[in-house]
Amino acid sequence: MKSLFMAAIVAVLSLGSVIAARATDLDCVSTTFNLLSPNDKVCVSVFEDPQVPGVVCHISQARKGGWGQPLGLNEDPSNFSIACRQIGPIDVALSKLGQSEEVFSQKTSIFFKTTRIYRIVDQPHRTIVYLAISTKIVNGSPANAISTVPIMPWPH
């Protein structure tokens, strides 16, 4: 029984590492000037789909400045954009991917708000759709954006 419990814990932990992509900030551009505190800014981040080698996504997000920023207390606005592209051969079979899976998640407030990106498979059109949404536990946000990646042959 104990070994079954440990196996379940290992499976859950390894599943989390397979699902969640890590984003790297490329650059941030200030959008306001605050004399005595950090500026509001828009940051561009990049991540690769962990289950679809050959796809890279860039997401831009507004980030709130002020004194709450260094402490992580600010709630970032639900303003974002996403662009995903095929940058290499895509050899994974679309039928092996789930119809809809979360591939990226980033907290945008200390408590209840998160930006999530889902991969949605459109098998009839051989396309992968990436849907970015902002969530809140109490009132969900209608903010969303999509990017599509048609699977194209890649020259070798």
Residue ranges, per PLM feature:
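Positively charged n-region of N-terminal signal peptides that target proteins for export
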Residues: M1-L4
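Bacterial N-terminal signal peptides
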Residues: A7-G16
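Short, intrinsically disordered, charge-biased short linear motifs at domain edges
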Residues: G16, D40-V46, Q69-L73
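Sec/Tat signal peptide C-region and signal peptidase I cleavage site
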Residues: V18-A23
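Extracellular/luminal recognition modules and glycoprotein regions
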Residues: L26-F47
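Mature extracytoplasmic domains of secretory-pathway proteins
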Residues: G54-V121
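C-terminal partner/receptor-binding element of secreted or periplasmic proteins
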Residues: P124-H156
